[in-house]
Amino acid sequence: MKEVIAVKEITRFKTRTEEFSPYAWCKRMLENDPVSYHEGTDTWNVFKYEDVKRVLSDYKHFSSVRKRTTISVGTDSEEGSVPEKIQITESDPPDHRKRRSLLAAAFTPRSLQNWEPRIQEIADELIGQMDGGTEIDIVASLASPLPIIVMADLMGVPSKDRLLFKKWVDTLFLPFDREKQEEVDKLKQVAAKEYYQYLYPIVVQKRLNPADDIISDLLKSEVDGEMFTDDEVVRTTMLILGAGVETTSHLLANSFYSLLYDDKEVYQELHENLDLVPQAVEEMLRFRFNLIKLDRTVKEDNDLLGVELKEGDSVVVWMSAANMDEEMFEDPFTLNIHRPNNKKHLTFGNGPHFCLGAPLARLEAKIALTAFLKKFKHIEAVPSFQLEENLTDSATGQTLTSLPLKASRM
């Protein structure tokens, strides 16, 4: 298992709320320390848009093959590890292209087109259960269940087992915690074993009887004569499930938070013009996706970032800060769904490792927000809501555990 870089020692936020809305910290780092060395973690930290983009795309100087990482996902147990042939986050081109191609079979544009009606049906069902005039917990009612149900459905597993998937994902994506890491690792190993034992028979069955789902697509996937074994498919779906669920759930919950607290007029504007929803989703990804970061290892000595970097140095790029760079985005600390270049955000990365699941996350968010906007004309915050008490650590930063709101059709 790789050494996990303790990024909390770099940020040193005093409250969960401060980490959830890290704008002051991002502004300070962009203005005062755009490329800076952090002695405690022995890392170089990069914040400016062009520098972050350079590190993510220039694999000849900044490699994904590394001994340290900021990502604490999954476990190093036999059942919970990522198969070597799809370790796309830990490889550079040309190896990376082959590994990514194997995985990309599950995320083709054709697949997305086929999935759209299914996602629409699930979103409509969840929103159909909400009553206007009453208090709705948007996390429990939509942001949390939608991605889980969608992923379970797209993978072709029985709908009755969806809640099991939620439990496993929550555990496998627990963040790094230096004080409790031994306990966290044990929980992850148990979850990985339970998941593996549950899914393996389903994969075996789908090899015999393929269907229109992700598991069957992975079983058919072939690049240069290489295919997945049943074992590899099980472990691969664990990665897909976790990444697909966490990202979308986070995006949906934070979008509703933003509509309630960042700019209350945006909801009404979207309600009156649903064509603006895709733009709003992009701005939420730029403005309200908290602290996203990735790490790379310096491949050879260079001064491309204006400092002397040595081979083997660890570099952490902060995409969230890059999304707030005023040299790229005008008035960056303001929510603006009409921003002409908001799709240039780096939330899903850049270069060879651009997030494979980005189109699915965008599609789910667009469908869910549109369906909600069609049903409810107005939303308002619940005065008793305390943000600090409703946040928890996750692999994607501070995650909302609850977000009550009042919605009305009038």
UniProtKB/Swiss-Prot annotation:
What result is annotated for mutating Q398S?
30% of 15-beta hydroxylation activity (for progesterone)
Q: Which SUPFAM superfamilies match?
A: Cytochrome P450 (SSF48264)
EC numbers on record: 1.14.99.-, 1.14.15.8
* Cofactor(s) listed: heme
Q: What family does the database annotate?
A: Belongs to the cytochrome P450 family.
- Supply the Gene3D superfamilies for this chain: Cytochrome P450
Predominant location of this chain?
Answer: cytoplasm
Query: What's this protein's name?
Result: Cytochrome P450(MEG)
- Gene Ontology cellular component terms for the protein in this record: cytoplasm
Q: Which domain of life is it from?
A: Bacteria
Per its UniProt record, what InterPro entries does this chain match?
Answer: Cyt_P450, Cyt_P450_B, Cyt_P450_CS, Cyt_P450_sf
Q: Which reaction does it catalyse?
A: reduced 2[4Fe-4S]-[ferredoxin] + progesterone + O2 + 2 H(+) = 15beta-hydroxyprogesterone + oxidized 2[4Fe-4S]-[ferredoxin] + H2O
Gene Ontology MF terms in the entry = heme binding; iron ion binding; monooxygenase activity; oxidoreductase activity, acting on paired donors, with incorporation or reduction of molecular oxygen
Q: What gene does the UniProt entry assign to this protein?
A: cyp106A2
Membrane-spanning residues where?
A: none
PANTHER family for this protein: CYTOCHROME P450 YJIB-RELATED (PTHR46696:SF1), P450, PUTATIVE (EUROFUNG)-RELATED (PTHR46696)
* EC category: oxidoreductase
**What keywords does the record list, in alphabetical order?**
Cytoplasm, Heme, Iron, Metal-binding, Monooxygenase, Oxidoreductase
Q: Where does the protein end up? A: Cytoplasm
